[in-house]
Amino acid sequence: MKNCGWVFALMLLLTICSTTPSVAQKEKTVAEHAAGAFEVKVEAQGEADKAEGSTLGRYSLDKQYHGDLEGTAKGTMLTAGTEVKGSAGYVAMERVAGTLKGRSGSFVLQHTATMTQGEPHLSITVVPDSGSGQLVGLTGKMNIIITAGKHSYEFDYTLPTAQ
């Protein structure tokens, strides 16, 4: 039991953090929806790491957003492909800079995706407290739609009301 002190400290920290409202939580927020198109350039960063059963890759992302979100994004994506057709995964971080429905600043999106034998699962969320400028306090989730090779986004988000 003498090594349980760190467990208690961690539980105490989690309890304090979960009950202490952040600055963004104290302010009134408004739910919004944004949509538009984007172009993306994906470029391999080095050679793929191939081994029995899987291939790992690293890529740079360069995006141009249009519509309710006008701006650019740069990021890094890590991928894993398998020998099973339609099964793979990726994680990515991208820093978006631009104007979201008239409010300028930047924020970071975190992507987590898997595909199991052709069945995709994708989660794209705003990294907490990553907003800057007029986008401080931004939270939200983005969805990507690909139709006939064209990319578009749907972005449900909240922001503190403008002062």
Region roles according to the model:
Residues 1-8:
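Bacterial N-terminal signal peptides that target proteins for export
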